[in-house]
Amino acid sequence: LYGMDKIAVTCGHYDAYRKNAEFEDSLELSVPLAKVDNHPLNQCFNEDANNLVKRIEADLVYIDPPYNSRQYCDSYHLLENVARWEKPQVFGVAKKMDRSGMKSKYCTTGATKAFETLINDIKAKYILLSYNNMADKGNCRSNAKISDEDILKILNAKGTVKVFEESYKAF
């Protein structure tokens, strides 16, 4: 996955490509070495968080849902496909696979309800949430789907909330 980005004719994501871009002569794909001293009870999941939290309990749950209307699957479908090695049919000039079943409700007007359901279903001592609200700094597609007020209301209904804010430069 790291090697793919070095020869991609994209701008860091895979939703669009740069026409007439030059490729390197070769691509070397290497497998990163897994960390061998991980605690044996640590687990990593790759599935819809709203489904996952119904089946697990944890000390800490870290969530980083999509912030705006830009669907992750549109930008990172190629990396996801290589990681899973599913080789789906592709279509169109850009040779994209059908991603309709991968769309996230967090990128729609249903984001607040999906977030509330997620938080209510989490069984953990701590929830760590990363959420970027650009407010009026970006274009309309960059605007957060869940307001800060709704996030705080939902989290406060679950338990004690501490907010840590970090300034950032919008691009």
Q: What role is predicted for each listed range?
A:
Residues 1-76, 87-98:
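SAM-dependent nucleic-acid methyltransferase catalytic core
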Residues 31, 51, 55, 81, ...:
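Charged/polar, solvent-exposed surface patches and flexible loops
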Residues 63-66, 80-82, 147-149:
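Short, low-complexity, polar/charged sequence segments that are solvent-exposed and flexible
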Residues 69-122:
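SAM-dependent methyltransferase catalytic-core segment centered on the flexible catalytic loop
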Residues 69-71, 135-138, 170-171:
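Flexible loop/turn segments at secondary-structure boundaries
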Residues 104-159:
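Conserved Class I SAM-dependent methyltransferase catalytic core
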Residues 160-170:
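Conserved S-adenosyl-L-methionine
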